[in-house]
Amino acid sequence: MKHINNIKRKGDLAEYYAVTWLWDNGYEVFQNSGCTGPIDMIAMKEGQATLIDVKTMTKDKDSPNYRGKISRTEAQKQLGVKFLLFNPETRKLRWSRHGK
């Protein structure tokens, strides 16, 4: 994988992969026009709306594995935002398992 240094570019890449992954999984996707706020996109499937924040997973310096270790903000928790985690090495996505 080509290394991407620009953090904004990393986020853009993750979001583009997220959109196509969501399409492949039967969702309609509506993206945020700005780069700030508690959500990146809204995905609709079977009449249900899912508020999504896409996060690029990072490697721990002590481990070769990627992980998503970012917590939702209070606003995201109140809105019911779900994290969709992007692995930049494999280009795969998965839903985060959120606690309460």
Regions found by a protein language model. Give the residues of each.
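Conserved catalytic cores of phosphodiester-cleaving nucleases, focusing on short active-site segments
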Residues: 18, 22, 41-43, 47-58
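Short beta-strand-loop-alpha-helix junction that forms the active-site gateway
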Residues: 8, 54-66
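Short connector loops at helix/strand junctions that flank enzyme active sites
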Residues: 36-38, 47-51, 78-80
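Structural signal for conserved beta-strand scaffold positions within catalytic alpha/beta enzyme cores
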Residues: 31, 53, 85-87
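Domain-level recognition of nuclease-like catalytic cores that cleave nucleotide substrates
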Residues: 69-70, 75-100
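Acidic-basic catalytic patches of nuclease active cores, encompassing PD-(D/E)XK
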Residues: 1-32
